[in-house]
Amino acid sequence: MDRHEHFKAPANEDELDDIDDDMVVGVIAEIEQEVLNESESDDDEYDLVDMGAPEPQQADGHSSSNESISSDGSFDPNAEDSDSDDSMIDEAASGGASSAKRRKEQTATDGVGASGSGASGGADYSHLDDDDETDETVRAIIAAIKKPRSAPPEIKLEDFITDICFHPDRDIIALATIIGDVHLYEYGNEENKLLRTIEVHAKACRDVEFTEDGRSLITCSKDKCVMVTDMETEKLKKLYETAHDDAINKLHVLDERLFATGDDAGTVKLWDFRTKDAIFELKEVEDQITQMLTNEQNKLLLATSADGYLTTYNIGARKLYVQSEPYEEELNCMGIYRGSSKLVAGTSKGRLYTYNWGYFGYHCDMYPGIKSPISLMIPITDRIACVAGEDGNIRACHIAPYRNLGVVGQHNMPIESLDINCSGELLASSSHNNDVRFWNVKYFEDFGDIKYNEKHNAYKEKRHNLPSSKCTNASDFFADMTKDQDDDDNDGGNDTAAGPSNVT
């Protein structure tokens, strides 16, 4: 290592005495000159300017690039360094704030908010281009963002949602709440718009239905009243005050003139819009009526109850038609399938019971189901049903023969209500989390019929996620890997040097 000539090792101790103060002064002067040259270099000057520091002024007596060097060239170790860490950080921060302000102004000019969504239908992601990205993950995220929605976004309310119902003709959905209000939303794939909120009941509105022409809303409540309200004017058209002696739980519209109600004590009543009082009433069970329905002929009215009975009423004769044997579980829901030849009922133990139409005394077939309570059922096609309950999953199943087709959608909490729109393409569900989610189920149109002797894996079917589900299947990931491997193998197969064949 080269040494400065003033610091060469002395030959003996006498040479140390020969070093005088002039030599020390000379060394200090050289160090001062080196520091001064470095501080005045062009590179350091540009670096400081780029970091936001003020440009050094000319030698006019007001300032210098390094205040630690005095005007006479002497070095003052106690002088304050103008380029200290604190000053540099403050100036860099001010420069960064200016850059952030410019970015914010540019974002406002482009019209894209920080939230990425709004009443106008959401943010504009057209400027994103996945072709410019090399990272596969980033490209996948951009592609998912730009992918058009196939179902409306989620609706979130502050109050508990007790029931939902689609309009028979328009893209409108009614949401009944626990405080007695009904919210009407116009839904679309890009946004949902609140049309109006109708205050109908003093207590919880338990069920809401549209009339067949879609002009009026029928609601029942815990306050024992039934109300018919004009959907457009919000005016009350008819009030059935104290329609039942107990809280009303279910409604069912038969046609343009008739509708039925069922209460918590098991009483069923049939009403005519043109009259003030009920046409008839029957009490054949002692517990809550959970669901009511009829077929197209409207000759029989069926009702399930929480005490395990399927009760059938003859509408024309206004009397009991038949009542099933009691079940040791609640019958919560039902649907008609196979050309109105089969009735399927769901239970609190997750079972599905099948009845031949007209023979409702006892079931002809039973499917173990999903081992989780089934509280809701909606027919999607003549052979496919969607069921939901306390586990928060909406599952599709094939009727006669029974097969689990997979999971249609999910909620984080138990599902409270389920309905399908007039076109049969959109399914809506509400949960205990005060939310309504939409699921596009149009893909069921392409499902083929299932044969009785067809082999299947019940374990995989129960956990399989359908296209509308927010979850993906692990097998889909490995299927893509297999596909890529097959493509590579096919490319290599065309090369004679790819390797020896395994064929013997």
UniProtKB/Swiss-Prot annotation:
InterPro entries: WD40/YVTN_repeat-like_dom_sf (IPR015943), WD40_repeat_CS (IPR019775), WD40_repeat_dom_sf (IPR036322), WD40_rpt (IPR001680), WDR55_POC1 (IPR050505). SUPFAM superfamilies: WD40 repeat-like. Keywords: Repeat, WD repeat. Residues 1-21, 33-132, 477-504 are annotated as: Disordered. Pfam families: WDR55 (PF24796). The keyword Repeat applies. PROSITE patterns: WD_REPEATS_1, WD_REPEATS_2, WD_REPEATS_REGION. WD repeats lie at residues 156-195, 200-239, 243-281, 284-323, 326-365, 410-449. Residues 63-74 have a biased composition (Low complexity). Residues 12-21, 33-48, 78-89 have a biased composition (Acidic residues). The keyword Repeat applies. Belongs to the WD repeat WDR55 family. This is WD repeat-containing protein 55 homolog. It comes from Drosophila virilis (Fruit fly). The lineage of its organism: Eukaryota, Metazoa, Ecdysozoa, Arthropoda, Hexapoda.
